[in-house]
Amino acid sequence: MLIRKNLFKSFPQASHSQRKKIKQAFYQHLCDLLAESIKNISISEHELKRRFKVSNYSVLNKLYAEGKDVLLVSGHYNNWEWMITAQNLLLKHQAAGIGMPLSNAFWNKKLNERRARFGMKILNANNLQNYLCSDHPKPIATLVLADQAPGDSLKSYWMNFLNQKTAIFFGCEQLAHQYDSAVVYFVINKRKRGYYKVDFQLICDQASDMYYGEITEKHTKLLEKAINKHPEYWLWSHNRWKRHIPENLTELKTEQQAKFEKRFPNIKKKVTQEIKQEINSENPKLARYAKF
């Protein structure tokens, strides 16, 4: 029922048969993921590197040479678990990953042991700040899967995603500004069953050069593009749209932006068309906006 509902709202123009075809393809892919998750328990370093490859190292190698920490952002698309496990084998940066602990302590420990066995550092709300603020022998690449429903609709970034108003996790953008990290989007492409290739795309190397919301808008739209191309590879079984749209959304967005720009005063500011016109007419009252 949830999968059918998500597909209907995301692809309202598609026919019933088209959505049914996507659902069937998703179930087939989900079976592959389950088998690959079991394989992930015992897969060797050699076998994982043979099955999971990088298509372009240049983006991250340049940032590594510059000593830049990176936020790697994507969603639950294709085999994200293999990406988590393989990241420290594939990239020069020290791998780290942010996630919510499972409610079952036993399975949470087992899952994180599998994820961390090749060097991935597992982070959560309790150890994130200490780890990112500590000194490290090499730059860090912190992986964030930012497509799950946020915990609080009033602290989310609201935007259109898959044809509907959606609450987006805003933590990635906050971390980028707080720790002066570069932001890189990654997409995992399925070459064939059990074989993947990850592609990296730079969103920004300097968060302060981006407008409020621009980082979030960009990585979300890139994920949306991937989903529209191959919808069967996204996790449709997640209750993505369970947050209700706030009644005062316009006022909320204005307040959120004001607070964010106060916290990070060096962020690039948007200038409305009206202000630009008055600046161009040399209105002295608006001289303070010229630096934007």
Task: Give the role of each language-model region.
Residues 4, 84, 111, 172, ...:
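Generic structural marker for isolated residues within well-ordered, non-membrane alpha-helices
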Residues 21-24, 62, 90, 126-292:
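Non-catalytic C-terminal accessory region of glycerolipid acyltransferases
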Residues 1-74, 108-113, 119, 264-292:
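Membrane-anchoring hydrophobic helices of lipid-metabolizing enzymes
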Residues 66-126, 151-157:
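Catalytic core of membrane glycerolipid acyltransferases/transacylases, capturing the structured
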Residues 50-54, 104, 122-125, 165-166, ...:
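A conditional alpha-helix N-cap/helix-loop micro-motif detector
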Residues 49, 73, 100-101, 162, ...:
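A generic secondary-structure micro-motif detector
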